[in-house]
UniProtKB/Swiss-Prot annotation:
Any Pfam family the entry gives: LpxK
Protein name per UniProt: Tetraacyldisaccharide 4'-kinase
Presence of the UniProt keyword ATP-binding in the record: yes
Enzyme Commission numbers on file: 2.7.1.130
Amino acid sequence: MKAPYFWSADLDPKSREAAPLTRLLLTPFAMLYLWALRRKLAKARPEAAPVPVVCIGNLTAGGAGKTPVTEAIRNRIRSAGLRAASLSRGHGGAEPGPLKVDPARHTSRDVGDEPLLLAGSGEAWIGRKRPEAARAMAADGAEIILMDDGHQNPSLKKDLTLIVIDAGAPFGNGHVLPKGPLREKVPEGLARADAVILMGAGPVPPEVTASSLPVLRARLAPLAAPPPGPLVAFAGIGRPQKFFDSLAQAGGNVSDAVPFGDHHPYTKGDVQFLRSLAHDHGARLITTTKDHVRLPLDAQSEILAWPVTAVFEDTAALDAVLAPIFKRAGKP
């Protein structure tokens, strides 16, 4: 779904745009959601995996950059000589898992967009039952499991928890779902974490400073310059505007931009609409790599994908955070 406009932090809470009546009506649902999450976390008995588990999660609904961060950390672990694999729930996919994702056989409708994207550059698994999936991964030879987006899932014991926060839009309006974008109260989420990865430019949020957690700075960097000529950009991610702005700032000639809801399953009708829009502008279509894998197969060859990667400012600091995991996995 598209993030409601009133989730934004840049609004006067009493203004019409901030939808004070809507927020008031959603307050009981936010309280119920928070009560259910706290109860689930309190009653949980996490199962230990046969190998170390690194959780890469966040505190908001989408848009923080977990997937490229997961890919970058997986690459860092692999460069140390260890076999690392990502584990996702497989949101939006029909397969329950445990399943090793194969880009040659699976589509986003099978396994979800993020696992399919991660499988394009390394080993990726899905599993709705995380402990069962972790056992299957270890039996297959994985030495370290990167649990993509599992901070609010207590079923699997984590050896290290990293929270990804978008420095440009850390916590939205500060309210919990559905009143705001937060999956839980910020201090409670940070209390279960070991470090914070702050994505992009912006100050360290006061809540993070108060937590005394180590902060790793990272940013998204394009792997290639935007293609020349006019472009019609579209995206169905947590913060589509972030993609549009990045594309323009990198020199892309963005004639028009179309936001879709997060994890939007593109249809032939969507593609036809986008083709028509591009034709009107005399432009080519371009989207994120995550959106590209959700396109109908017959449309993927004609639509451009603009790849980005997560770059850590201080890789030595990242290695220091990962050191206990390396040690447990048998790599001094």
